[in-house]
Amino acid sequence: KLCDMVTPQMRVAGKVLVSESGVSDTDDIKVLAKSHADALLIGTVLMEAVKPQELIAEFKGVYDNEYDKTELIDQNGLTEVKICGITSMVDVNLLIKYGADYGGMVVFYPKSKRDVTIEEAGRMVEILKKSDIKTVAVTVSPDEEQILKIQDKGFDYVQIHGELSENVYNLCKLPIIRAVNISQDDTDSVKKSIESATAMDKVVGILLDAGIPGSGKTFDWDSVKELELKEKKLFLAGGLNSSNVAAAIKCVEPDVVDISSGVEYDDVLIKGKDEQKVKEFICNARAAK
């Protein structure tokens, strides 16, 4: 009961939640797993155990199995989180640890510093799928050969920026997330792009971004209210970070918030995602109302 007093903000601040009593068997461990405690203090039952090390291993196995890694707090009805531009197994483990809903990998776009080979992406897909995290191949103006290679690696979605040719569309068997760059000085062009995308049956989501993907730039969120997305899922990207994600969710009410540069290290020479930023972003997104 007391675990309800631990707020998401306290977790983000690095407060450690310890459960200090009441453990006698694996059923108790299963109950405590729902609290997302960082540590369990177990005394008497271990002191009385014939083989305490084996009991610790059993308790830990049960706890890890019961711990719902896709939740930091109750997520029912809340905005989902997509971490884009992951480049390594270290990034993959962060998504699993903090409960991201989607993991995006940039492929066939060497201009991006986040570009990975299709083989590297495939290995990350295998691990993410085991944790029920949806996988997204992020690419720009793919050709027919590239779309086939993406499909062969078992991605759940393909996110397409730039051009989407008729041949590629017809060949694609994956659900498509169509990216649209929001330009404040060309509203008509944006509306036409969205109208075209929403008319496509294979397009299940519209991703709204500002300028160059991964640039960290925002756009006028109020402008989204004027757009007709029909029944397509709305992915909101562009300049999001842990400080503004709650405001973005409140203003736009997106289905998914999408972040890349906002969870990377301040030092541009360090590649990959910053664990503290990933944790803060996901926790703040979950807490937003």
Regions of interest found by a model, annotated:
Residues 5, 33, 46-76, 117-128, ...:
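C-terminal helical cap(s) of enzyme catalytic domains, especially alpha/beta-barrels
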